[in-house]
Amino acid sequence: MFLDFIDQVTSILNDAVSSAGFEADDMELGPSQHADLSSRIAFRLASVAKQSPKDVAEKIAGEIVIPKGSFVEKVEALGPYLNIWAGRNFIEGTVLAIREQKEAFGGNFSEGRILLEHTSANPNGPLHVGHIRNSIIGDTLGRILKRAGYDVELHYYVNDMGRQIAIVSWALGYFEFDESSKPDHAIADVYIKANAELNAHPEKVAEIDKLMQLVEKGDAATIETFDKAVDLAVSGIKETLKKMNVAHDEFPKESSFIRSGDVSRIIEEIKATGRTEIDNGALVVNLQDYGFKKTLVIQRTDGTSLYTTRDLAYHEWKGERADRIIDVFGADHKLISGQLKATLNAIGKKEPEFVIFEFVSLPEGSMSTRSGKFISADDLLDQIKTQAYEEVDKRRPDMPDDFKATVAEIVGIGAVRYDIVKVSPEKSTVFDWKEALDFEKQGGPFIQYSHARACSILQKAKDEGLWSSEEPINTTLLVEDSEVSLIKKMAMFDNMLDQCAKELRPHTFAIYARELADAFNQFYRFVSVLNAEDEQLRSSRIALVDCARMVLANTLDTLGLGAPESM
C-alpha cells in the first residue's frame, strides 16, 4: 500500500513542480519526523532557479492539486521541505486490502529472475557458528526477494574439487569413518586426523597433489571417492540447514564446470583480453586498471585450475540464466570478490552483486575446522533449544511437555535467526543466547509473542461470540492515534520489501518487524478491544487485530521465523 501512496505523491508533486515552472525527474522522497513523507526537491531546484529552497518549496506547495479519492491528505511546505500526509482513504484502504489479500498483502510487485548463492561452506565438516550468519542473511534475502515477486533460485555452490576435499577423500582411505555420527561431523573427524598426519609426515602431501591432478583430468575412480566424501558431508549440512529453516533449490558442483568445458572456455576468453601473463609458471590476470595491484592466478604451474577459475565459469553460467546474480560472502572474500567482478567485467559478462558480511562469534571464542577447535552450528542450535525450553517452562509450567518442546524449537530458532539478521552485515556481532532469548527485549521472541497475543485475542473473541472473521468492518471508526499508527506501519510492509530487495540489506526488514510488533502492542495497550464500549467499534478493533495477525505472520515468514499461535 505504501508503494501506491508513494506513486500518488510522486504524480501530484510532478504536476505541481511543472506548474510552478520547474523541471525534475526525481522528487527525492524520504521519511520524515513531521509527516508520512518528505521531499527535498526544493534544494536541487533552488540552485537552477537561483532562488532559496524555502521559496521554491512554497511555490511548489502553492501549485498542489490533490485528486478526489487520493491517498494523499495534504502537502505543505515547511522551510525548504515539502511534507506529505496520508489521509483516510489510505488508512481505510490499507485495512480493507489486508482483509482481502491476506497472505498476499504487500507482495508480488516486482519481476525478474534472480540466482542467489549463499552458505557454500566447504564440505569438509559441519557448519560452524561463522557459517550461520551467511545462511541466515542469504535465506532471509531470498525470502524478501521471493515475496517481492522475483523468481528466485537459491544455490549452495559445492566445492567438490579443492585441496580440502582431496584431503578428506585421502583420509577416508586411511582412517575409520564413524557411521554412527552425523555424516558431516564424521567427515570433520577424519579431516582433522588427516591434517595432523600430513603435518607429521610432509612427504605424504604429494599424494594430495596427485589426487587433485587426477580429479581434474577426469579419472573415474578418483572422482568416485571425491563424490563419496562430498555427498556425505553435504547430507549432514542439509540436516543442519533444515533445523534453521533454511533451504536451497540447487547444489551445483564445481566439477560440473570442468566437465562441461566451461572452465577451459573462460580461460580462453580471459586470454583473449590480453590481460594474462605467466608468473613463475602460473597463468595470472593483470587487473591493475581495476585498482588491484595483486594479479589473479587462474591456472597453476601443473595446468590445474583454481577455485577462482571455476567460480568465474560458474558466474558466467549464472549470468546467462538470470537478470541478477547475488552472492553472500564473508569479509575474508572482499579481495577475491572484487577480482571476480573485475574479471567478469573485462570479458563483458554480467557482474554479480555482493553482500559482504563481517563475522559472528560467541563469547567462548573463535572457531577453526582445521585445528578441530570449533563450535558447530548443531551444538549451538541444540543449546539454544534447551535454553528456550527452560524459558517456556518457566512461563508456562502448566502446559504439557510436547507444547513446551514445540514452542521452544520455534522460539529458539527464531531467536538465533533474528538476533543475527538484525545486525547490519558490515558490522561484526557476538551472538549471546541469553540476550537473544530475552522475552523482555524486542527480539525474535518479542515479535513471535506479539503474533501469539493477536491469536489469543481473536480466539477469546470467537469463544465469547463477540466476532466472526466474516463480519464487515467499519473502518471509519478506527481513528485513535495508536490505531492509525498501527495501520500505517502495516502499510509500510511493501515499501520495506522493496527497499530491502533493492539495497540487499535484510537487517532493515528485521528492524521493521520489531517496529510493527511494537506498534501492535502499543495499540493493544492504549485502546480497549474486547471491552470496547460500542459493539461496532469492538468488532472493528477485533478485525484490526486480525489484520495485525496476518501482517505479523507475513513478516515473521519473510524473516524465516515461525509464527506460534500460543506461547
From Swiss-Prot:
Query: Membrane-spanning regions, if any?
Result: none
Kindly indicate whether the keyword Zinc belongs to this entry: no
Q: Where in the cell is it found?
A: Cytoplasm
* Motif 'HIGH' region: where in chain: 121-131
Q: What is the lineage of its organism?
A: Archaea, Methanobacteriati, Methanobacteriota, Stenosarchaea group, Methanomicrobia
| Cellular component GO terms, alphabetical | cytoplasm
Q: Which GO terms describe its molecular function?
A: arginine-tRNA ligase activity; ATP binding
* Organism (species): Methanococcoides burtonii (strain DSM 6242 / NBRC 107633 / OCM 468 / ACE-M)
Q: What is this protein called?
A: Arginine--tRNA ligase
**PROSITE patterns of this UniProt entry?**
AA_TRNA_LIGASE_I (PS00178)
Listed GO biological process terms: arginyl-tRNA aminoacylation
The gene designation is: argS
Q: What is its EC number?
A: 6.1.1.19
Keyword list, A-Z: Aminoacyl-tRNA synthetase, ATP-binding, Cytoplasm, Ligase, Nucleotide-binding, Protein biosynthesis
Entry coiled-coil feature ranges:
none
Question: Which reaction is recorded as catalysed by this protein?
Answer: tRNA(Arg) + L-arginine + ATP = L-arginyl-tRNA(Arg) + AMP + diphosphate
- Which family does the record assign? Belongs to the class-I aminoacyl-tRNA synthetase family.
| Pfam families in the cross-refs | Arg_tRNA_synt_N (PF03485), DALR_1 (PF05746), tRNA-synt_1d (PF00750)
Organism's domain of life?
A: Archaea
Cited InterPro entries: aa-tRNA-synth_I_CS (IPR001412), Arg-tRNA-ligase (IPR001278), Arg-tRNA-synth_N (IPR005148), Arg-tRNA-synth_N_sf (IPR036695), ArgRS_core (IPR035684), DALR_anticod-bd (IPR008909), Rossmann-like_a/b/a_fold (IPR014729), tRNAsynth_Ia_anticodon-bd (IPR009080)
